[in-house]
Amino acid sequence: MDLGIKGKTALVCASSKGLGLGCAEALAEAGVNLVMNARGAEALEAAAERIRQDQGVEVTTIAADIATEAGQKAVLNGVGQIDILVNNAGGPPPGMWHDWDREDFIKALDANMLAPIAMIKALVPAMMDRGWGRVVNITSQSVRAPIGVLGLSNSARTGLTGYVAGTSRQVAGKGVTINNLLPGIHATDRADALDGNVVKQRNISLEDARAERAATIPAGRYGTRHEFGAACAFLCSQHAGFIVGQNLLLDGGATNLTM
């Protein structure tokens, strides 16, 4: 399917690896030029060069911590016209409710709520002026079904979801859509960290931890970044203009919900 976005430019945050990279790869395959962002310059440039070689699109890299105001300014100062924004940032660490203090919550809110809001506020007005734009926020399945050990993530990402619910409906009339992708477990570094936490808590092997988690997923496996990226690219496409303020679960059926 031709997504109808060839020649547009996307800013994909936290895209040197994992789900962000999956989104960048899928958009590049659709002919979209990229501005890729991540904290580590070396890994970021390596990922960008692979995409340049594979897809022949223009790829600019900006190494900065998007969770900070300084990082956001660095990224925004380094971009031109942005048609597509993919908000992404690493999730806060797992733990128990009594482990977290105020600073832990502030860090989680900065990375997973306030940073994407800042990027939306900075880039969406110009999209509205042009009459077209796409914003996709990578959140978590925990927005729909909170996960006990991910209380920091539950809190911050749910806050972003509430913001998007209202904002998306205010900008849709100008041709701009804002939607959220809610990943369940995917084969990423984040999954490794979560499984590693299970290993420590229960004194089992990493293989057993992964097998137990996979057994709770109707699909029987972890998702891939390529599957996730394909969903992201569709939400950014010309075909998704009537999808507004939605939360799309990509979890292999793990979250048993009908609405």
Q: Where does each model-flagged region fall?
A:
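Substrate-binding pocket helix/loop in short-chain dehydrogenase/reductase
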Residues: 72, 96-98, 104-109, 135, ...
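Alpha-helical segment proximal to the catalytic Tyr-Lys
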Residues: 125, 169-170, 241
